C-alpha cells in the first residue's frame, strides 16, 4: 500500500489508466469480433465493411500502446486473409 502522498497519487493514476486501457482493449476486441462474425456468416461485403471500420481503431490502439504493434499487424493480416479467401470463394 502506498504511504507517501505522491505514491498514493500515482496509485490512483495507475488504477484510472488501467480502467481506461481495459475499456479501449474491449473496444478493439468488439471491432474484431464484428469482422469475424461477418466472415463466419460468409458475407464478404459486410466483412469488408466491418474490416474498414476496424483497421483505424486497431492502428490507433497500437500507436497508443494499448496493444502491441505486432499484435495489431497480426490481427489485420489474418482478418484480411480470411476476407480475401471469402471473396475468392464467392467469385468462384
Swiss-Prot record:
Residues 1-23 are annotated as: Disordered. It comes from the Bacteria. GO terms for biological process: translation. Belongs to the bacterial ribosomal protein bS20 family. Binds directly to 16S ribosomal RNA. This is Small ribosomal subunit protein bS20. One of its GO terms (molecular function) is small ribosomal subunit rRNA binding. It comes from Pseudomonas syringae pv. tomato (strain ATCC BAA-871 / DC3000). NCBIfam families: S20. Residues 7-20 have a biased composition (Basic residues). HAMAP family: Ribosomal_bS20 (MF_00500). GO terms for cellular component: cytosol; small ribosomal subunit. Keywords: Ribonucleoprotein, Ribosomal protein, RNA-binding, rRNA-binding.
Amino acid at each position: 500500500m502506498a504511504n507517501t502522498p505522491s505514491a498514493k497519487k500515482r496509485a490512483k493514476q495507475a488504477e484510472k489508466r488501467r480502467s481506461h486501457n481495459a475499456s479501449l482493449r474491449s473496444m478493439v476486441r468488439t471491432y474484431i469480433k464484428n469482422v469475424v462474425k461477418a466472415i463466419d456468416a460468409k458475407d464478404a461485403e459486410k466483412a469488408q465493411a466491418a474490416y474498414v471500420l476496424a483497421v483505424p481503431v486497431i492502428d490507433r490502439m497500437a500507436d497508443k500502446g494499448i496493444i502491441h504493434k505486432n499484435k495489431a499487424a497480426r490481427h489485420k493480416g489474418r482478418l484480411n486473409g480470411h476476407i480475401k479467401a471469402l471473396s475468392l470463394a464467392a467469385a468462384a
